[in-house]
């Protein structure tokens, strides 16, 4: 799977309640949104950014493990940039490629996984988790 490039990223709070036809409730589940830009300097390393707009950027460093049991795994750490609104932020991401259906029609590559806030910031506690989906642009 090609990782280098741009991916549309969205994370969602893990709330088991159904939203029905309430669009505002559905929107309130979005934890974060932006664009992952990945580079792969080696087959096992990943660097890049998560740009959420408005100066909110995390610098990413990660590992790619294509030889683990099961699908390739991605373990990524996101660090806030000094002098920006993300100063002091730290998030961890764990993901793997979405299954590519052999008979899928117009399927776009995806990465699915989970995220945890590794350090508290802006009055929000560490340990908050969410699920994420990143879709190839």
Give, region by region, the residue ranges found by the protein language model.
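Short, solvent-exposed loop/hinge segments that bridge or flank secondary-structure elements
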Residues: 1-53, 119-132
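Beta-sheet ligand-binding and adhesion/scaffold domains
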Residues: 2-14, 63-137
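Predominantly extracellular/secreted and cell-surface proteins with exposed
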Residues: 29-86
């Amino acid at each position: 799977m090609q990782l280098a490039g741009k991916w549309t990223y969205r994370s969602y709070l893990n709330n088991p309640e159904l939203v029905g036809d309430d669009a505002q409730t559905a929107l309130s589940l979005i934890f974060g949104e932006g664009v992952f830009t990945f580079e792969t300097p080696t087959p096992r390393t990943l660097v890049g950014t998560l740009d959420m707009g408005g100066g909110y950027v995390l610098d990413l460093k990660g590992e790619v493990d294509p030889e683990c049991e099961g699908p390739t795994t991605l373990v990524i750490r996101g660090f806030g940039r000094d002098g920006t609104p993300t100063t002091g932020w730290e998030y961890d991401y764990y993901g793997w490629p979405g299954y590519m259906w052999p008979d899928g029609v117009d399927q776009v590559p995806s990465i699915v996984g989970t995220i945890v806030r590794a350090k508290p910031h802006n009055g929000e506690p560490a340990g908050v988790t969410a699920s994420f989906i990143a879709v190839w642009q």
